[in-house]
Amino acid sequence: MSRRRHSDENDGGPHHKRRKTSEPLEIEDRLESLICRVGEKSTSSLESNLEGLAGVLEADLPNYKSKILRILCSVARTLPEKMTVYTTLVGLLNARNYNFGGEFVEAMIRHLKETIKLNAYNEAVYLVRFLCDLVNCHVIAAPSMVAMFESFVGVTQEEDIPQVRSDWYVYAVLSSLPWVGKELYEKKDVEMDRILSQIEAYLKQRQKLHVSILQVWSAEKPHPQEEYLDCLWAQIQKLKKDRWQERHILRPYLAFDSVLCEALQHNLPPFTPPPHTEDSVYPVPRVVFRMFDYTDAPEGPVMPGSHSVERFVIEENLHCILRSHWRERKTCAAQLLSYPEKNKIPLNYHIVEVIFGELFQLPNPPHLDVMYTTLLIELCKLQPGSLPQVLAQASEMLYTRLDTMNTICIDRFINWFSHHLSNFQFRWNWEDWSDCLSQDLDKPKPQFVREVLEKCMRLSYHQRILDIVPAAFSALYPASPSCVFKYGDESNSALPGYSVAVALTNAIKNKASDKEIFNILKDIPNPNQDDDDDEGISFNPLKIEVFVQTLLSLASKSFSHSFSALAKFHDIFKALSESDEGKLHILRVVYDIWKNHPQMIAVLVDKMIRTQIVDCAAVANWIFSPELSRDFPRFYIWEILHSTIRKMNKHVQKIQKELEDMKLRLAKQHKHRDSDDNDEDSGRKDGPLEEQIERLQEKVESAQSEQKNLFLVIFQRFIMILTEHLVRCETGGIDVNTAWYKNCRERLQQIFLQHHQIIQQYMVTLENLLFTAELDHHILTVFQQFCALQS
């Protein structure tokens, strides 16, 4: 009996201790949950929730102050759509505990400086805005906020800095004024007028060469595509004219005015913006996306005008929701649809415009394209009675404006629309788009419909497309995705290499070895054997043609069959692709046999790069070759090129990462050696690591050289074909601005935009070798616009 009691005590002891040690963690988790979820669905009002939470936090401050500070600083960055809820909470805590309010303000300033140094400028904007709203909650004194704004605007006077640095500090000030402008003007109107005058002077002298490369549409009608600072400035000017009155910001602190106005306020410490360094990377400028106005939503609430600050506030809050919840499409969709004050605005129109604005954002969308697709599908499920109609209206608008739409954005529109249709049984009223049938096939509308059908086929099958799209569209139907094996028909028996192709077919079917295959191929005569060029003698195009055509036709049943064939006969491919011409000819043959199946071409080229049968430069040269001129404007061609560039970039990054890791290992080894003076072996251990670092350094330099060469090849080819077009038009008295020219020039822009961070490294080389002052201004302007993105 006593033994059992003793056992019970032993069991209870450790369990009791574990519970005690876990209690603080449980309380911290509970505090985090309470803070993060305040203002969400609740039976009681937001005000009573805030008051209750302030009481709970005040009681926990003695034991959990640092944790509460961390959580509040974190939500200021990560949940900006609930900013005014959290500023009110901080205001209530400051009214109850002045010291805590001071510590919170100090912590926020520290976070702001760290965030700027880390180049996290989007989050830094939220922190600035949060500090501004604390002025409304009587936590921060208005004069010290004005002083911070003065230091921000002072950046515009700095010398030898990129314009994008000044842009960000001006944006941080202007974008905060909808929340705090009224309060600051009441307290410091003279100083605020001076700040706005400085901003106006800065905006007038800014260069805006970058605008056209970032616009979704080249036409200014029906909606101007304004530069973001110009648009925001117009909105703030109108807000000032309206005496800083706005009607869309949730301001829960107004309910606590009698409590908050009694609180003591804190002065912000003098703020010096962190200086510009070589490592500073500022946000790229933007163009404001406009798709709808009040005429597009005739029923229900009126959509605010483009220069109304309410339009900015609504869009900014919706962007914040997307940033906070993009990883969870269901949560994100629900949050968007439960937007506060949603009954006062045409919410569905705002949501669709904001989502398309992000999807079409140049240089790149904030998130993966597929995120926006799945989010719109989720929104349609949650609002089946209204949102699909708005989305159909938007699709129709986008289609009607294809002639002036940027080619990069047309690509994204194709991807989204085809993916969206695949989730709704490919239902669409194709007759509404029959106007494209009377246009030349190289025009944007027929090209768009053709590419959409091609993409839809990838997501279903060929016959399905023929069944759902009217026969009137047959000229735009995708080709039947079958291979074209020229040695498969006896009527072609007179073709050179035909008999070898038959023998090769039988040998592969009978599982012949590589040696046996080589023996069959050696009998193929070389059409280049009379050439004087040594490389011409070793390069046999007919041998490549017979082998690649035969093998790929036998493996044509599926992607996996083709992949297996490449793997099984990899050594033969490597032997045939020893020369640059050999690599290029393999790609030509892949195109010849699979010209009716663009997706197969794309996956085979991808696999050949991965298995080093061909290299990235060969793919670039092939894409610009005369054999592909017919398909040059096609979507899949650029899909292949960008995939090739990404592979090269990832290869370089992988080796750079290996080098950095190795250097860290060596540094740790040195640190360990310094702390252990008696270790005589440590010096000997450095040797192998240093040798590995040296080898990796050489690999990095070699990979970067390949990367630079790839971009040089691509840009050189662009310059050549664009120059040929311009000369041809000039000598023939033809208008330069053809559909082909628009497409090609915008594809050049796409290379710059999609890979801008990598290309920045090679700017000097590009400027010295290719984009020189002598180049035609039609081409040179694209390079200058790109340079302006970070200047």
Curated annotation (Swiss-Prot):
Compositional bias ranges of the Basic and acidic residues kind: 1-14
Quaternary state and interactors: Component of the nuclear cap-binding complex (CBC), a heterodimer composed of ncbp1/cbp80 and ncbp2/cbp20 that interacts with m7GpppG-capped RNA. Component of an alternative nuclear cap-binding complex (CBC) composed of ncbp1/cbp80 and ncbp3.
Keyword set includes Cytoplasm: yes
Function: Component of the cap-binding complex (CBC), which binds cotranscriptionally to the 5'-cap of pre-mRNAs and is involved in various processes such as pre-mRNA splicing, translation regulation, nonsense-mediated mRNA decay, RNA-mediated gene silencing (RNAi) by microRNAs (miRNAs) and mRNA export. The CBC complex is involved in mRNA export from the nucleus, leading to the recruitment of the mRNA export machinery to the 5'-end of mRNA and to mRNA export in a 5' to 3' direction through the nuclear pore.
Residues annotated as domain MIF4G: 28-240
One MF term in the entry's GO annotations: RNA cap binding
Positions of region (Disordered): 1-24, 668-687
Family: Belongs to the NCBP1 family.
Coiled-coil ranges per UniProt: 641-714
Keywords: Coiled coil, Cytoplasm, mRNA capping, mRNA processing, mRNA splicing, mRNA transport, Nonsense-mediated mRNA decay, Nucleus, RNA-mediated gene silencing, Translation regulation, Transport
Subcellular location: Nucleus; Cytoplasm
A matching Pfam family: MIF4G
The name this protein goes by in its record: Nuclear cap-binding protein subunit 1
GO BP terms in the entry: 7-methylguanosine mRNA capping; mRNA export from nucleus; mRNA metabolic process; nuclear-transcribed mRNA catabolic process, nonsense-mediated decay; positive regulation of mRNA 3'-end processing; regulation of translational initiation; regulatory ncRNA-mediated gene silencing; RNA splicing
GO CC annotations, alphabetized: cytoplasm; nuclear cap binding complex; nucleus
Family annotation (InterPro entries): ARM-type_fold, CBP80, MIF4G-like_typ-1, MIF4G-like_typ-2, MIF4G-like_typ-3
Domain of life, per lineage: Eukaryota
